[in-house]
Curated annotation (Swiss-Prot):
The gene is lspA. It is an enzyme of class 3 (hydrolase). One of its GO terms (cellular component) is plasma membrane. NCBIfam families: lspA (TIGR00077). It catalyses: Release of signal peptides from bacterial membrane prolipoproteins. Hydrolyzes -Xaa-Yaa-Zaa-|-(S,diacylglyceryl)Cys-, in which Xaa is hydrophobic (preferably Leu), and Yaa (Ala or Ser) and Zaa (Gly or Ala) have small, neutral side chains. This is Lipoprotein signal peptidase. Its EC number is 3.4.23.36. InterPro entries: Peptidase_A8. Keywords: Aspartyl protease, Cell inner membrane, Cell membrane, Hydrolase, Membrane, Protease, Transmembrane, Transmembrane helix. It is a multi-pass membrane protein. The chain crosses the membrane at residues 64-84, 91-111, 127-147. It holds the Pfam family Peptidase_A8.
Length: 165
């Protein structure tokens, strides 16, 4: 499969999985009433409405702030999709697809609910990770993929320079 269709497929899969988990947890379970639901000694499901971005940064409690975050998410998704259309590798296209799917998933939440629904809480002892969702995980994995691709490209360039010398 060529990079662009692959990246778009990854974006669509990320978006569908994100929205399906959110809708299922909000409307098909009693999580909003019975939280937290303990999955393991280190993981639980909770309901958190995040009006900001990752890690709860840039909290927006106004309609203007909400719609600015929606606009930034949509513009980022468009720009990353344009980048995806020009890439030559499935790795890079897939990484971009994870970010695009996650950005659109969280934008849908902001449009529908005024905030992003986060629900996975990981913790151990006194340590607690921020509460996140599938879209957030997709964005983080996508950024990791971009970093991996950059390191891989740098190594490839270094090998080519050495072989030319």
């Amino acid at each position: 499969m060529r990079p662009l269709p692959f990246g778009l497929l990854v974006a669509a899969a990320t978006l569908v999985l994100d929205q399906a988990t959110k809708l299922g947890l909000l409307f098909l379970t009693d999580l909003p009433i019975r939280q937290p639901i303990v999955l393991a000694p280190f993981a639980q499901l909770v309901v958190v409405w995040n009006r900001g971005v990752s890690y709860g940064l840039f909290q927006q409690h106004t309609e203007l702030g909400r719609w600015l975050l929606v606009a930034v998410s949509v513009l980022a998704a468009v720009a990353l999709t344009a980048w995806m259309a020009r890439t030559g590798t499935r790795l890079l296209a897939g990484a971009l697809g994870l970010i695009v799917g996650g950005a659109i998933g969280n934008a849908i939440d902001r449009i529908a609910y005024g905030a992003v629904f986060d629900f996975v809480h990981l913790h151990a002892g006194g340590w607690s990770w921020y509460v996140f969702n599938v879209a957030d995980a997709g964005i983080v994995l996508g950024v990791a993929g971009l970093l991996y691709d950059a390191v891989r490209a740098e190594r490839r360039n270094a090998r080519e320079i050495r072989s030319d010398a």
